[in-house]
Each structure stands twice: as structure tokens, then as C-alpha cells.
Design a protein with these regions (language model features):
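Charge-rich, well-structured scaffold segments of protease-associated domains
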Residues: 1-6, 25, 36, 80-231, ...
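A short, hydrophobic C-terminal helix/tail in secreted or cell-surface proteins
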Residues: 326-330
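His/Glu-rich zincin catalytic helix
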Residues: 1-83, 188-294
Length: 330
């Protein structure tokens, strides 16, 4: 019987082999990276467009442009897209971050012809229907109002605004009225500027076959797609950090308190970034980290405390997050 009082030996990894992707330049100039690793007949396709919060002209423009891609195209409405993806056992993920928008498809290899047809329509010919947009905006407003009563949400907003300043895209806080300013025309403007072949890169992973690469090249790599083929210019933003070191956001009706501690830190391009990621993981990035073992296991102050690096462009944020009984922990 296993004696759980005996701690397992700590062993150093003997060898860590990281497979390198194959880099291909498609005929229309789109870079394609292929990581052929996997035994199951499944492929993941990622299309990245260099257009996120740092490039938008108004708050939420990048987010809703990406979010609305699946809500209707010239060939399929939202119900047809959802039904077809479900029928073929595929999964579509849409997300928007600081610098990039992501369109991700998981598909069984045997149904790639059908699922890639849907993916092509979503990327190349969205229509941003007004009715569906109105429903999604209303739902997001309700979620925003719910979140606005949560102490961890308010603490995070207070931290990034204090570190970056209200005019920096990292510290510019979304308000309820920003949702109401989103229209199909606003989304179409952002789509035309950033969703095109000269601003796109593609990544394939899983059990990638030659047929899959051929189909990707046929749909996204032979001819240019989009309307505005200018490469987006990178705009540099400079943080304006507040002089105050302690900021209090009062919520008299709140049942909990949240603490966020943070400082401007490294971005992904810094030579010490990966070392810092490992260090912060040991400090507070997983269940057995130092923060968790000290604050939760030893002192019993909370169920959860964590630390992380948020790698925003230019300067990231090193943050420690905690929500529960504030006074004893401090």
C-alpha cells in the first residue's frame, strides 16, 4: 500500500525536447506554421489578425468585431453556423487580446472540407447583422453591470488604471455607454482595416496531413483576401503611473474584499521574460506555490491567492491577486 507520508523524490528532467514548427510562406504572403504532433485525427487551425485593443479607435471595437464573426455571413446565418459546426463535431473559439484577434477551429480531419468552408466564410465575409449585435450588446451590458458589483473586478480595474493611466489602452476602463456606441458600421471599419491577408498568420497543430495544408493554402493562401491591405502601423503608448501607492475603492454593501498589488514589469520581448515567468510561477502561479502554501495552507486566510505576469505590449504587469478576508491577510 502506498505510504503517503513518504514524499516522492524530486528529480531533475533528464531531457526536454521541444518540437519546432515547420515554417511555410503561402503564395499570397501569409505565413503558415505547422506543428505536426498528435495521434488523434484532429487538427487545430488558428488564424491570427494583428488587431486588438491597442489598435482600436474606441473601446470594445476589437472585441465585438471578433465576437460577431460567427453571427452571420453572406452564406450562413448564426443558426446555420452553429448547427453545421455541431453536426461535424467541430469547435470554434473567438477571442481578442491586446495586439491580436484569434479565430480558432478544432476539427476532425475527415470533416475538414466542410468545417473549413464555414471558417472561410466567417473570416472573409461576415455581415455584422444589426439584430444579433443588439442582442449580444444587451447581454454584455448586463454582464458588465453584474461584474461591476464584484470586488475582484473593481480591484483589477483600479490596478491597471493606476499603473497605465486612463489614456493608455491598458488602463482605459470600459464604461456602460461604450457598449451603446457599438454599431455594425464601427465593427465593419475595424474589420476592413485589420482582417486581411497582409495582416494574417496561420498556425496548424495536431495530426496535420498534407491534405489539410493543401486546403488551407487553397482557401487562405492563394489569393489575397480583404479590402485594406496596408500593414498596420505600431503605435507606442507610454504609461502614466499614479503617484498614489494605496488606492481604496469603497463598496459598503460588499460581502468580501479584494486586494490587488502590482507593478509595471517585463513584456514578452525582454530577454529575462521567460526566467521571470518561471520565478513568478514558483511564487504564486500554481497550487503548490509559495503564496498558496503560506497564505492558504499555513495561515488559512483564503482559498486562493495567486501571482502572475500579464505580458501587455511595451510593459507588462506583475500582479498578486487575493479575495477574501482582507484584514487578517494584510
Amino acid at each position: 500500500m502506498l505510504n503517503r507520508s513518504d514524499q516522492p523524490r524530486i528529480l531533475e528532467p533528464e531531457q526536454l525536447a521541444v518540437q519546432r514548427p515547420e515554417r511555410i510562406k503561402l503564395p499570397n504572403g501569409v505565413p503558415l506554421s505547422v506543428l505536426n504532433a498528435g495521434d488523434n485525427e484532429v487538427t487545430r487551425i488558428d488564424l491570427l489578425m494583428a488587431g486588438g485593443r491597442w489598435q482600436q479607435k474606441q473601446p470594445l471595437q476589437a472585441l465585438f468585431t471578433n465576437r460577431m464573426l460567427r453571427e452571420g455571413t453572406r452564406r450562413y446565418d448564426a443558426a446555420q453556423i452553429a448547427e453545421k459546426l455541431d453536426y461535424y463535431g467541430a469547435w470554434l473559439e473567438l477571442s481578442s487580446a491586446s495586439e491580436y484577434a484569434y479565430v480558432t477551429l478544432y476539427s476532425l480531419n475527415k470533416y475538414l472540407p466542410q468545417t473549413l468552408d464555414i471558417l472561410e466564410s466567417i473570416v472573409k465575409e461576415p455581415v455584422f447583422p444589426e439584430k444579433e449585435l443588439g442582442v449580444i450588446v444587451d447581454n454584455n451590458i448586463q454582464q458588465f453591470l453584474v461584474n461591476s458589483s464584484k470586488v475582484d473586478f473593481l480591484a483589477h480595474r483600479g490596478l491597471v488604471k493606476a499603473l497605465y493611466g486612463g489614456q493608455h489602452p491598458g488602463g482605459r476602463l470600459v464604461q456602460e455607454e461604450d457598449y451603446r456606441r457599438i454599431t455594425p458600421a464601427v465593427l465593419r471599419e475595424f474589420y476592413d482595416r485589420y482582417y486581411h491577408s497582409n495582416n494574417c498568420s496561420i498556425y496548424l497543430s495536431g495530426k496535420v496531413t498534407g491534405d489539410c495544408i493543401h486546403r488551407i493554402e487553397s482557401l487562405f493562401g492563394c489569393e489575397a483576401f480583404g479590402t485594406d491591405f496596408r500593414k498596420p502601423e505600431k503605435t507606442e503608448f507610454h504609461p502614466v503611473t499614479t503617484s498614489g501607492k494605496r488606492i481604496f475603492i469603497e463598496r459598503p454593501d460588499a460581502l468580501q474584499s479584494a486586494v490587488r498589488m502590482g507593478m509595471l514589469s517585463l513584456d514578452r520581448n525582454h530577454p529575462d521574460y521567460l526566467k521571470a515567468r518561471v520565478l513568478v510561477t514558483l511564487f504564486g502561479g500554481y497550487f503548490g506555490s509559495r503564496l498558496m502554501s503560506n497564505i492558504r495552507e499555513d495561515k488559512g486566510y483564503t482559498y486562493g491567492i495567486s501571482a502572475a505576469i500579464m505580458p501587455y505590449p511595451g510593459q507588462g504587469v506583475l500582479a498578486v491577486s487575493y479575495t477574501h478576508l482582507t484584514l487578517p491577510t494584510i
